[in-house]
Amino acid sequence: MGQKVNPVGLRVGVIRDWESKWYAEKDYADLLHEDIKIREYIENRLKDASVSKIEIERAANRVNITISTAKPGMVIGKGGSEVEALRKALNELTGKRVHINIFEVKQADLDAKLVAENIARQLENRISFRRAMKQAIQRTMRAGAQGIKTQVSGRLGGADIARAEHYSEGTVPLHTLRADIDYGTAEADTTYGKLGVKIWIYRGEVLPTKGKNKKEGGN
C-alpha cells in the first residue's frame, strides 16, 4: 500500500524554504528542542489568531521569529501590547534576546493549515463533516486554487468504527516537485474523541529560480 510523504518536506530545497534557518554543531539538539518549545508556546498562546507558519532564525545570542497570521491585529494587540508581552515571555523561555516580526497572510483560503483549522473548529461546533469539507473546497477553489484534496478521519458522526472520508476538486499532482502544494493538518476535539483533518492545496507551478550570479565557463 503506497504511503504518502509530507508534500512540504519533499519540496524543501526545491521550491520551499526551511522554517528553521540556523546552523549548529554540538548544541544542535538543544536548539532543536528550543525551536519545538517556541513553536508550541506560540501555537498555544495564539490558537485563536489563525497562525499559519512560524519561522525561526538565529544569530549569536539572538532569535528572530516571523509569525505568519491571517489576524495580525489580534497578535499585535492595542498599541503593540500583545506582541510585546509575547516577546517578554519568549525571552524568559529561551534566555535569549527575541525579536518578533508579524507577516499577514492575505488569502487565508489558500493556506492549507488555516483551512484545516477552520474545518476542525466547525467539527467541534457539531457541524456536519461533509458540509464543512465541501464549503472549504468551494471557498478555496473560488480563491484561485487549481486543486484541493481534503480528508477527515476518526469517529465521523459518532460512529462506533473510525474511518476516513476524502473529498477533492481539481488536480493535486503530489509527484510533481515544481508544483506548489501546501499541506496542513489540524485536530478537532469532539465528544466522541479526536478527529484528524488533512488538507492538500495545489496553487500552481513554481519554476525554481537559478542563481543569477553563477559564473559560467572555466574561469
Curated annotation (Swiss-Prot):
UniProt keyword annotation of rRNA-binding present: yes
Keyword Ribosomal protein: yes
A GO molecular function held by the record: structural constituent of ribosome
Keywords: Ribonucleoprotein, Ribosomal protein, RNA-binding, rRNA-binding
Domain KH type-2: 38-106
Pfam families per record: KH_2, Ribosomal_S3_C
GO biological-process terms attached to the record: translation
Annotated function: Binds the lower part of the 30S subunit head. Binds mRNA in the 70S ribosome, positioning it for translation.
Subunit structure: Part of the 30S ribosomal subunit. Forms a tight complex with proteins S10 and S14.
Annotated HAMAP family: Ribosomal_uS3_B (MF_01309_B)
Official protein name in the record: Small ribosomal subunit protein uS3
Organism encoding this protein: Halalkalibacterium halodurans (strain ATCC BAA-125 / DSM 18197 / FERM 7344 / JCM 9153 / C-125) (Bacillus halodurans)
